[in-house]
Swiss-Prot record:
<feature type="modified residue" description="N6-carboxylysine">
    <location>
        <position position="125"/>
    </location>
</feature>
<dbReference type="InterPro" id="IPR037237">
    <property type="entry name" value="IlvD/EDD_N"/>
</dbReference>
<feature type="binding site">
    <location>
        <position position="82"/>
    </location>
    <ligand>
        <name>Mg(2+)</name>
    </ligand>
</feature>
<dbReference type="GO" id="GO:0009099">
    <property type="term" value="P:L-valine biosynthetic process"/>
</dbReference>
<feature type="binding site">
    <location>
        <position position="197"/>
    </location>
    <ligand>
        <name>[2Fe-2S] cluster</name>
    </ligand>
</feature>
<dbReference type="InterPro" id="IPR042096">
    <property type="entry name" value="Dihydro-acid_dehy_C"/>
</dbReference>
<dbReference type="InterPro" id="IPR000581">
    <property type="entry name" value="ILV_EDD_N"/>
</dbReference>
<keyword id="KW-0001">2Fe-2S</keyword>
<keyword id="KW-0460">Magnesium</keyword>
<comment type="pathway">
    <text>Amino-acid biosynthesis; L-isoleucine biosynthesis; L-isoleucine from 2-oxobutanoate: step 3/4.</text>
</comment>
<feature type="binding site">
    <location>
        <position position="493"/>
    </location>
    <ligand>
        <name>Mg(2+)</name>
    </ligand>
</feature>
<dbReference type="GO" id="GO:0051537">
    <property type="term" value="F:2 iron, 2 sulfur cluster binding"/>
</dbReference>
<keyword id="KW-0411">Iron-sulfur</keyword>
<dbReference type="Pfam" id="PF00920">
    <property type="entry name" value="ILVD_EDD_N"/>
</dbReference>
<keyword id="KW-0028">Amino-acid biosynthesis</keyword>
<dbReference type="GO" id="GO:0009097">
    <property type="term" value="P:isoleucine biosynthetic process"/>
</dbReference>
<comment type="similarity">
    <text>Belongs to the IlvD/Edd family.</text>
</comment>
Length: 620
């Protein structure tokens, strides 16, 4: 038996005050020291459709924990909506919020001696922030997200009915052929329900990744927020966290702990799945940060290795025609994992919060196997209800059948990939010696090789200006620098630039490169995370208008056609002048300056520099 963390304050005279406060908060004296305290890390807020319903989720989870024999204690973290923060200085705060969320969960659980944890995230930075905290804390933990929203249904001016999502309205804003009335129609219809934005954007990619790494139950990444099966998932997750808490404390079974589950093999599995489904490039940042929190040696080199050997077998929006509900109908994350397993691409001996091995889980949940349970087959029939409402679990709509077509369906088998290269790739060259990332699943084949003159800007705002005023021409490479973790600071997403080039009709004729990030909703030849960043003396700071940029995705290369001697000469000129300073007008708050002071480059997950922190604090 392992002593519960809460035991230290649940007995003895010295902690009578702590117990008095717990009693005042509603904890029964009869339960103190006998039942595990289960922290519920919720992220409800009314700014985000992905989180607007999570207060109701918290109540469901709390009641289920009580019924299962735990003591639920709920608290909230912040949640930044990238779609609302996008395109203005609000986006500077998005990535830094990830680390603050991780701190919040760590602080709350350690300050109050929580025995176990259930996390209720949904949107972009909340999922990785909570994952980082869980891996730091290493107490029994289960994740259950709020779920994806349904895709929209928009009737176009010509009467065509189109499946839409948030990215469609952003494309339309820069398309001069779309009238204000048509734009308003998009605005009203592309986001019909609560939930994280439809499509394989960052939020849904991260919720799928959590399932793949073993810290969430099947369906976590793909059951729609509007479907009644999502409510069932919340109840099952709540019971599971109490179960594994008892396994750890009553049976001393440390296999249920996050660090026992999220091993290097599990990280490799999760990244393999991510590459196969063409997830958001932001997942690269977050999985690197998670690995550091878990003390797992998993680096950009591992991601590069995986991307060379795993094809893309699932292309959901924005890279393809399929929506998240289509991926769910095809078997969801266990469907993708099943195909990867049959191709010998996974470590099947890893375990999860609910199964002793991945092999055992796939036997029950992979819809292509004869052993797949009736429960699994029924769950994967959960379909959109096509009801416009912010309320969750409003319907019980089911597909008539499952999508088992592995040649032309939403999930392909390894012999019929969407593209033979992985959906994500790491590029290197004299422009990014420490690496950069591109979502290959979203790059048209005709521009996998690109060569053209650079148009250089020092901010996202300047990038938007040169796109909308038509300074950016077909054949050019738009270089957006000083937007990295330090240089931004905050490593902004560039969804507006990628959306606007499509709205202008040149999305297949230009390249974009940045030391910042791209949204999970971005597609096209959009290369991000260039390391070292400009503010860290990276070569991208040396580029000038007209320099020839050469990109070859198949060769995994990104270069500027300058010699080492020419780059060295430019570096000397720059350092003799203003140095590595962005030419723009931007106010940076004290909070963002504090983030910038400790931020490492993208190839390290844009995490805080532990060596610098230790040096300045004087603490080990």
């Amino acid at each position: 038996m392992t002593e519960m963390r809460s035991a230290k304050i649940m007995s003895g005279r010295v902690f009578a005050g702590a117990r008095a406060l717990y009693r005042a908060a509603g904890v029964s004296g009869d339960d103190m020291g006998k039942k595990p305290i289960i922290a519920i890390a919720n992220s409800f807020d009314e700014f985000l459709p992905g989180h607007v319903h999570l207060n109701k989720v918290g109540r469901i989870v709390s009641e289920a924990i009580k019924e299962a024999g735990g003591i639920p204690r709920e608290f909230n973290t912040m949640a930044v909506d990238d779609g609302i923060a996008m395109g203005h200085t609000g986006m500077l705060y998005s990535l830094p919020s990830r680390d603050i969320i991780a701190d919040t969960v760590e602080y709350q659980c350690n300050a109050h001696c929580a025995d176990a944890l259930i996390c209720i995230p949904n949107c972009d930075k909340v999922v990785p922030g909570m994952l980082m905290a869980a891996l730091r804390l290493n107490i029994p933990t289960v994740f259950v997200s709020g779920g994806p929203m349904e895709a929209g249904t928009t009737v176009l001016a010509d009467g065509t009915v189109k499946s839409t999502d948030l990215i469609d309205v952003m494309y339309a804003t820069a398309d001069d052929s779309v009238s204000d009335e048509e734009l308003l129609n998009y605005e009203k219809t592309v986001c019909p329900t609560c939930g994280s934005c439809a499509g394989m954007f960052t939020a849904n990619s991260m919720n799928c990744l959590t399932e793949a790494i073993g810290l969430a139950l099947p369906g976590n990444g793909t059951i729609l927020a509007s479907h009644s099966y999502r409510k069932d998932l919340f109840e099952r997750a709540a019971k599971q966290v109490v179960k594994i808490a008892h396994q750890y404390y009553d049976d001393s079974d440390d296999s249920v702990l996050p660090r026992s589950i999220a091993t290097k093999e599990a990280f490799e599995n999760a990244m393999t799945m991510d590459v196969a489904m063409g997830g958001s490039t932001n997942t690269v940042l977050h999985i690197l940060a998670m690995a550091q929190s878990a003390d797992v040696d998993f680096t950009l080199d591992d991601i590069e290795r995986i991307s060379h050997t795993v094809p893309c077998i699932c292309k959901a929006s924005p890279s393809g025609k399929w929506e998240i509900s289509d991926v769910h109908r095809a078997g969801g994350i266990t469907g993708i994992l099943g195909e990867l397993d049959r191709a010998g691409k996974l470590h099947t001996n890893v375990h999860s919060i609910d199964y002793p091995t991945l092999e055992a889980k796939l036997a029950d949940w992979d819809i292509m196997r004869p052993t797949c349970t009736e429960e699994a087959q029924q769950m994967y029939k959960a379909a959109p209800g096509h009801i416009i409402s912010p309320e969750p679990w409003t319907h019980t709509t089911l597909f008539d059948s499952l999508d088992r077509d592995r040649t032309n369906g939403a999930i392909h088998d390894i012999d019929h990939p969407e593209i033979h290269e992985g959906g994500l790739a790491v590029l290197r060259g004299n422009l990014a010696p420490d690496g950069c990332v591109v979502k290959t699943a979203g790059v048209p084949p005709e521009i996998w090789k690109f060569r053209g003159p650079a148009l250089v800007v020092d901010s996202q705002e300047q990038a938007i200006e040169v796109i909308l005023n038509d300074t950016l021409k077909p054949g050019m490479a738009l270089v957006i620098r000083y937007e990295g973790p330090k240089g931004g600071p905050g490593m902004q997403e560039m969804l507006y630039p990628t959306s606007f080039v499509k709205g202008k009709g040149i999305g297949k004729q230009v390249a974009m490169l940045t030391d910042g990030r791209y949204s999970g909703g971005s597609s096209g030849l959009a290369i991000g995370h260039m390391a070292p960043e400009a503010a860290n003396k990276g070569p991208v700071a040396l580029i000038r208008n007209g320099d020839i940029i050469d990109i070859d995705i198949e060769a995994r290369s990104v270069n500027v056609e300058l010699t080492d001697e020419q780059l060295d000469e430019r570096r000397r000129e720059l350092e003799a002048g203003d140095g590595y300073v962005a030419h723009r007008n931007r106010h940076v708050s004290q909070a963002l300056k504090a983030y910038a002071a400790f931020a490492r480059s993208a190839d390290k997950g844009a995490t805080r520099d532990p060596e610098l922190i230790n040096k300045l604090s004087g603490l080990d």
